[in-house]
Swiss-Prot record:
Keywords: Repeat. The keyword Nucleotide-binding does not apply. PROSITE patterns: PPR (PS51375). This is Pentatricopeptide repeat-containing protein At3g16010. It comes from Arabidopsis thaliana.
Length: 642
């Protein structure tokens, strides 16, 4: 085959990448030079001067193209190495960076980098190492990237600047190699690389991203101890966010004040974080004052700020103010996003303002916000809670699917719970089957709602069947589901089954909670086992499970039903001395006990106490008192007639 110069455009190449032409042909050094020479006669006469030219000089660009052609055709191996040697081109840092930036396989770049490092009178510097590190990160070769970074920090000829160290930390952070990033950081410090605020910020932000908030505080303390390295706005923003996530609200507020004392202007993000903290600790007025301070400081609130604002006001029950801020935000020219609108709908739904909620939903399109599964869940939940007709709820569910929004596990849970509470158990059971068909995992909340509804409908066998199914599919069942099942076993007189479930809970290790104890005590009282129920109450508190008012009311009701007021009065005094406030059920239970026992003076005294405490008489209890008084009057009339 005839070998021709690369300048002959119409001639066939002497080298082919096709498999049947992959055999290497012996070439002279002159032929290789001819193939990749620059079409510039003057420059070819001065090969030693070409690297002194400006980066913008066309000849330099052409020189780079020769290397690119060699690497692309030969890949890497003896041919490529020989071609580079024959061309007698000087390998310098700019050339290495250029070759690493071209579009060739990562393995070619790695091999070229190693080859260049072995050249006489050449050593890699920080710029060539960093170029390779970026290539390795892009190729997701994180192990090779870390080994290269280790070379950088250990190489005595390479000077690692604070800016380079920041980039190394960020690269390892993005690769989720946090411990290795910290190791590199401290190795570089040991080599007298003095980190700046920016370097420390890179470490802090990496730790934050991985949720290592306690470590953030340690790095901040170390930074302050440097003496001449001071926190900046980025540092304060990261620290305040970390403290907020750790629940160290006082520390976050202190840092905010410290920042202002140091004449630093808080950012929108910092103000927004502080707003959330004040609302979380119940300091609503302080949060509103901070919002006004933010505006006075010339820091414009963002949609995230307004989201935090309406969430906090909604939680505090100040819904009108939250809705007012929505209108203010629109007047200020800010466009709400889907997260803001979902939060606003949630606030309106919780207080039953369904019409306004649906209006906000209909406005989403105007703001170019596509309703999400959260949007639909919020509407459906609000409709159930406002006692809307089931057909209206079903129409929203149909609309959701028509809009190609896939229902979530929570959607089904809301619907199943709502249908159960509206006595549409069969519809709820069909939805449970639909969940299974769609591949959703067993949802304990949905099962709990169904088990409870079936129990109320006295379909105890069906409830027990679902309970067993949940245990088989889900493994460990929540205490709340156990409590529901124990309650229904007690109601239908299957106390031994209820006790077995209670003991099963104890064997699981988590231990029964207050709901489970209350359910079993209620079953015992129903079965006339009042003393056993009272013993269980004492055992419950001995086991570290704090009784609530319902626990005491169950026992009080048991004593009241026995017709022995003394024990009921003792329980009432126990409740008051335990620090738990009696409720309306407590007073009405004792009042009924007094009425049945004919203790009218005590009943009258109890009624006055109830009135002082703001409790109303139960209609049934009040009627029984009147009946009892009437019976006494009849008895007196009968006696006087003799």
């Amino acid at each position: 085959m005839m070998y021709v110069s690369a300048r002959s455009g119409s001639a066939k190449r002497s080298i082919s990448s096709l498999p049947h032409l992959s055999q290497r042909f012996k070439q002279t050094e002159n032929e290789i030079v001819q193939m990749f020479s620059v079409p510039n006669h003057e420059e070819s006469e001065k090969p030693q001067e070409k690297w002194k030219l400006s980066r913008k000089d066309p000849s330099v660009r052409m020189l780079d193209e020769r290397f690119i052609r060699i690497v692309k055709i030969f890949k890497w191996g003896p041919d490529a190495e020989k071609a580079l040697e024959v061309l007698k081109l000087k390998v310098d840092h700019r050339l290495v960076r250029s070759i690493l930036e071209i579009d060739v396989e990562i393995n070619v770049k790695i091999q070229f980098f190693k080859w260049a490092g072995k050249r006489r009178n050449f050593q890699h510097d920080c710029s060539t190492y960093m170029t390779l590190i970026r290539c390795l990160e892009e190729a997701r070769l994180y192990g090779e990237m870390y080994r290269t970074i280790q070379e950088v920090v250990r190489n005595t000829y390479v000077s690692v600047s604070p800016a380079v160290l920041s980039e190394l930390v960020k690269a390892l952070g993005r690769a989720k190699m946090v411990s290795k990033a910290l190791s590199v950081f401290y190795q570089a410090k040991g080599r007298k690389c003095k980190p700046t605020s920016s370097t420390y910020n890179s470490v802090i932000l990496m730790l934050m991203q991985e949720g290592q908030h306690e470590k953030v505080h340690e790095v901040y303390t170390e930074m302050c101890n440097e003496g001449d390295c001071f926190p900046d706005t980025i540092t304060y923003s990261a620290l305040i966010s970390s403290y907020e996530k750790l629940g160290r609200n006082d520390s976050a507020i202190r840092l905010f004040d410290e920042m202002k004392d140091n004449c630093m202007q808080p950012t929108e993000k910092i103000y927004t974080t502080l707003l959330g903290i004040y609302f979380k600790v119940g300091k609503v007025e302080k949060a509103l004052d901070l919002f006004e301070e933010m505006k006075r400081a010339g820091c414009s609130p963002t949609v995230y700020t307004y989201t935090e604002l309406i969430k906090g006001l909604g939680k505090a029950g100040r819904v009108d103010e939250a809705y007012g801020f929505y209108k203010d935000m629109l007047r200020d020219g800010l466009t709400p996003d889907v997260v803001f609108l979902n939060n606003l709908m949630n606030i309106l739904g919780k207080v039953g303002r369904v019409e306004e909620l649906t209006n906000v939903f209909s406005e989403m399109g105007m703001w170019r916000c596509t309703p999400t599964v959260v949007s639909y869940n919020t509407v459906i939940k609000a409709l159930f809670e406002s006692k809307a007709h089931v057909s209206e709820v079903s129409s929203w569910f149909d609309k959701m699917k028509a809009d190609s929004v896939s229902p979530s596990e929570f959607t089904y849970s809301i619907l199943i719970d709502g249908y159960c509470k509206t006595n549409r158990v069969e519809k709820a059971l069909l939805l449970l089957e639909e969940m299974d068909e769609k591949g959703f995992p067993p949802c304990p909340a949905a099962y709990c709602s169904l088990i409870n509804a079936l129990g109320k409908a006295k379909r105890y066998e069906a409830a027990n069947e679902l309970f067993k199914e949940l245990k088989e599919n889900f493994g460990n069942v929540s205490s709340r589901v156990y409590a529901v099942m124990i309650k229904h076993f007690g109601k239908c007189g299957k106390l031994s089954e209820a006790v077995d479930l209670f003991n099963e809970m104890k064997n699981q290790g988590s231990g029964p909670d207050v709901y489970a104890y209350n359910a079993l005590m209620s079953g015992m009282v129903k079965a006339g086992m009042i003393n056993e129920a009272n013993s269980l109450l004492r055992k419950m508190e001995e086991n570290g499970c704090r009784a609530d008012i319902n626990s005491h009311n169950i026992i009080l009701n048991g004593f009241a039903r026995t017709g022995v007021p003394r024990r009921a009065i003792e329980m009432f005094e126990t409740i008051k001395h335990s620090g738990i406030k009696p409720d309306g059920v407590t007073y009405n239970t004792l009042l009924g006990c007094f009425a049945h026992a004919g203790m009218f003076e005590e009943a009258a005294r109890m009624m006055r106490e109830m009135k002082d405490k703001g409790f109303e008489y139960d209609a049934i209890t009040y009627s029984s008192i009147l009946d009892a008084v009437g019976n006494v009057d009849h008895e007196k009339d009968d006696v006087s007639s003799f």
